[in-house]
A protein has these predicted regions:
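Active-site nucleotide/adenylate-binding loops and adjacent lid/helix of ATP-dependent enzymes
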Residues: 111-209, 221-223, 253-257
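Peripheral (often C-terminal) accessory segments that flank ATP-dependent C-N-forming ligase machineries
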Residues: 314-402
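A short glycine-rich, hydrophobically flanked beta-strand micro-motif that places a catalytic Asp/Glu
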Residues: 269-281
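Protein kinase-like catalytic core scaffold
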Residues: 164, 225-226, 284-289
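Short glycine-enriched loops at secondary-structure junctions
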Residues: 32-37, 82-84, 221-225, 231-233, ...
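ATP-dependent carboxylate/phosphate-activation module, predominantly the ATP-grasp catalytic core
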Residues: 184, 193, 204-267, 291-316
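ATP-binding N-terminal substructure of ATP-dependent carboxylate-amine bond-forming enzymes
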Residues: 1-104, 141-151, 380-396
Length: 402
């Protein structure tokens, strides 16, 4: 039995990860930002602690984290969210050297290359991997060689075109991402976004159908793919482009091949999660970003028969992750995040017309991100957490704008 520490332990993906790690016989501890959350309330965690928020109180979290490691012994640390993955990648070398604890995250140099949206697009462009036209936007303080900011923006837009998306290079989810339809609108909105989020890129706007794809991969040390899952996300919230609340597992060899090539060029080791859009007009697929940690839709992989939890253990604590036999892969699995799906139902004009019906709660191929009959509290706590968030007018405005 190994002792495993999960960071961002309040996250919904902790529910299924803890369940599967528990089945494998490991002792699980989580650091959580709040108690009213899906992750904190799952019955599959053995120990849980409320910690400072790694994003909002970075220094306080760092102090808490190292004090916690002094008092507890672990064999493996797995980050379960964007901010904790970023934090752990920076601290990986120190943690592994000083505390002899393996960190299931890439080294910071590789992590940053994948996490930086502009740098990732440069890799895709260089190696002819499917992606939208993207160019770095200049510093808003640009003065070099007498160049005017407007002229540089104009040259960028000549390649990218309109409509386009201003995308911060480093941000979680859709934070800071803004659609613009003209050079004038870009000039107006870009400085404010850059001041808030730092370096940005301008990316071709992809008019997508009413779905997008998510690709999960685990790449071994020897470069071979241990396991993969592709899901077609058909309901998401917010409606303008958000997190999956209903998806279906599918087979898509082309997407797997493209994402594998991307990880190869990054010299990636471990788990990675890709968001991929399909151009509604051309049908072409485009990699948008990599999330270098397990996503909220992780339950879909387990529903498909792919055990990423075992891959983590075998790769980091054993003799290497086994290669999954795709003959055992299950397409057509339906996975819901009930708490978020309720928000979709309240806001979507398709609430009664969507197929399969929103009211199809049970079935042999239906499972939930946020719990089950055997572990119901994450669904209750997660739904309550969502209600509390949307009572905040600032949060509500940020999520529902556009």
């Amino acid at each position: 039995m190994s002792k495993i520490l999960l960071l961002d332990g309040e996250s919904v993906q902790v529910v299924c990860m803890a369940r599967e790690l528990n089945k494998l016989g490991h002792e699980l501890t989580a650091l959580c930002v709040q108690k009213v959350s899906s992750g904190y309330t799952t019955k599959y965690l053995h120990h849980k602690y409320v910690s400072p928020n790694v994003h909002l109180k970075a220094e306080a979290f760092k102090a808490y984290f190292y004090e916690h490691l002094k008092q507890h012994k672990y064999d493996l640390i797995i980050p379960m969210g964007d901010e904790s993955a970023y934090f752990l990648s920076r601290e990986k070398e120190n943690v592994e050297r000083q505390y002899r604890i393996i960190c299931a995250v890439e080294t910071y140099s590789t992590f940053e290359l994948a996490n930086d949206k502009q740098k990732l697009m440069e890799v895709c462009e260089k190696y002819d991997i499917v992606h939208p036209h993207t160019r770095a936007l200049p510093s808003i303080k640009l003065k070099a060689e007498g160049s005017e900011l407007k002229e540089v923006l104009k040259s960028v837009t000549e390649y990218v075109g309109f409509p386009a998306m201003i995308k911060p290079n480093l941000s979680a989810g859709a934070k800071g991402i803004t659609k613009v339809g003209s050079l004038e609108e870009l000039e107006e909105k870009f400085p404010t976004i850059a001041k808030s989020f730092g370096a940005c890129a301008l990316q071709q706007y992809v008019e997508q159908p009413d779905y997008y794809y998510n690709v999960m991969l685990f790449r071994r040390h020897d470069g071979k793919t241990a396991a993969s899952t592709v899901i077609k996300i058909r309901r998401f919230f917010p409606l303008k482009g958000g997190t999956s609340c209903y998806s279906e597992t599918v087979e898509h060899p082309f997407l797997i091949e493209q994402c594998e090539r991307c990880l190869e060029k990054l010299n990636w080791h471990g788990f990675a999660d890709f968001d991929v859009l399909e151009d509604k007009c051309t049908g072409k697929l485009k990699i948008i970003e990599i999330n270098p940690r397990v996503p909220s839709s992780l339950q879909a992989s387990f529903a498909a028969g792919v055990n990423f939890a075992k891959a983590f253990i075998d790769e980091y604590l054993g003799n290497g992750a086994e290669i999954f036999d795709m003959k055992n892969y299950k397409s057509g699995q339906q996975i819901r995040w009930f708490g978020l799906d309720v928000m979709w139902f309240l806001m979507s004009p398709q609430r009664f017309s969507f197929k399969p019906s929103w009211f199809r709660f049970w079935g042999k191929n239906v499972s939930y991100h946020d719990g089950s009959w055997h572990d119901p509290m994450p669904m209750v706590a997660g739904s309550l957490q969502g209600v509390m968030k949307y009572l905040d007018p600032n949060f509500r405005k940020a999520k529902l704008k556009g």
